Amino acid sequence: MAEREHRRGRREEREETPEFADRLVAINRVSKTVKGGKRFGFAALVVVGDQRGRVGFGKGKAKEVPEAIRKATEQAKRSLIRVPLRDGRTLHHDIEGRHGAGKVIMRTAVPGTGIIAGGPMRAVFEMLGVQDVVAKSQGSQNPYNMIRATIDGLKKEASPRNVAQRRGKKVAEILPSNDKPAEAAVEA
């Protein structure tokens, strides 16, 4: 018994460094019907990220709100994904994500645009570290579905390096250069 408590103490000592920011997206009161009546509890939905290209989400259920949030945060940290960002501020290309009846469309944006996204999507982009993006949610407005659809779309994003590697080319061959549109206009 003493050893078990000792291990717990060690776990608390190495508690996470504040490298991750977290955002509580939704909290619901849930109930379970049992023989004697209803037992109430809470479900929390949390998004966690390092604001430098990693993001994850988690949900937790417990009898008390703080415990539900703690469980959701732990699950979110275990489900982190890495997303390549262009110039550390926006997406490389337009993407679409789906989950259930939810559909999310995310588009790149020029500097200064800001995060134009609703509710749960905004939390994901802020925790990811995106500064300029335009996003639209269609279909299900359920926060769980919106976050899962957003994460699904972000998993599909490919950096120019990944695309070049798959095609067996160099990054410079894939990215459009700035002088080509001018040359095309002169020739026309």
UniProtKB/Swiss-Prot annotation:
One of its GO terms (biological process) is translation. Transmembrane segments: none annotated. PROSITE patterns: RIBOSOMAL_S5, S5_DSRBD. Residues 158-188 are annotated as: Disordered. Keywords: Ribonucleoprotein, Ribosomal protein, RNA-binding, rRNA-binding. One of its GO terms (cellular component) is small ribosomal subunit. Residues 20-83 form the S5 DRBM domain. One of its GO terms (molecular function) is rRNA binding. The N-terminal domain interacts with the head of the 30S subunit; the C-terminal domain interacts with the body and contacts protein S4. The interaction surface between S4 and S5 is involved in control of translational fidelity. Belongs to the universal ribosomal protein uS5 family. Part of the 30S ribosomal subunit. Contacts proteins S4 and S8. With S4 and S12 plays an important role in translational accuracy. Located at the back of the 30S subunit body where it stabilizes the conformation of the head with respect to the body. This is Small ribosomal subunit protein uS5. It comes from Paracoccus denitrificans (strain Pd 1222).
